[in-house]
């Protein structure tokens, strides 16, 4: 074992209880995206956890969502940076029955314990270990902590684009897969609201010629679900539907929320063509339909540069004797936005656990230390190769 590896693992072993305490402190603050006060408290707690480090810290006040935080080292990097990304919000509202902290052997349970407060702790203690060994000062790191990732990062997306434009590479600290999966690519997402308009009337009197918005929309929904399986990797889900006023009135209005996922831009285009054709045909039959794009997240393609970054991480994982697996994830994250700028990015460097977005969410205790060591080693190795011009296939 070389000195760097030996000293790093010893440093993080000494910090194991501090990592646990930091994670518990963050998890006990309920910070659902719409709970601004809770997210603000997490932001302040993270700000304080970073205080011992040689970082310039700036809280970015927000009106609608929780405050955000940006922290940077002073290292120049020739104008290029290493971008880290992590979000402070969870899906659990302030009054969620899933609250508190529980320990059971090798596992910690609690809201956001892997999605993604565990990732925040992994990153913070990786930087602490590098600072302790005098290595952080050579890394031009910028870390953006955002507050509304769980609803698609509507406020922070421009910030990520701006920071990614200055970055040579990026690491997103969402949780790792249960078998050590790390993402080199992610599906893109298209969120739509499809609306139908009918003609209101008394249900007892309107029999022939009834124009029901709900009935029209239901027929369209069946066709939309049939798009599944028609293009590689494309999934379509109509997750919400509502309409009408009372049971004895023909519904004049109805709407449905549609979630579309695709591993390629071509897949999204295919779905849009299917939807456009369906709407034109149904409108010719007399239906009144309209569609609104609610959200859109670009595909994070598994590029050669992303794979080059993963190769560095895999090499450091072998030194640590922990498993990692290259993976293409179905869900979207802030990594998609970073990739849209063209910056090489890896996601899933946070701790290992399961059942995020549920009351069974847990993290494997030992993975906090392991993934912190992996991140620290990968930052050093990737930056040194980048400076030498040997990191990416195109130099």
Model-identified regions with their sequence ranges:
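Metal-dependent amide/peptide-bond hydrolase catalytic core
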Residues: 1-7, 31, 61, 175-176, ...
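Acidic/His- and Gly-rich active-site-bordering loop/insert found
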Residues: 2-111, 132-136, 335
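Solvent-exposed alpha-helices and their adjacent loops that cap or buttress functional pockets
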Residues: 75-77, 101-102, 115, 134-136, ...
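Short coil/turn connectors at secondary-structure junctions
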Residues: 77-82, 97, 104-105, 137-141, ...
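Alpha-helical metal-binding/catalytic segments enriched in His/Glu/Asp
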Residues: 84, 104-151, 190-196, 203-227, ...
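Acidic-glycine-rich active-site phosphate/pyrophosphate-binding loop
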Residues: 89-104, 171, 185-195, 350-351
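Acidic/histidine-rich catalytic neighborhood of metal-dependent amide-processing enzymes
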Residues: 116-187, 383, 387-394
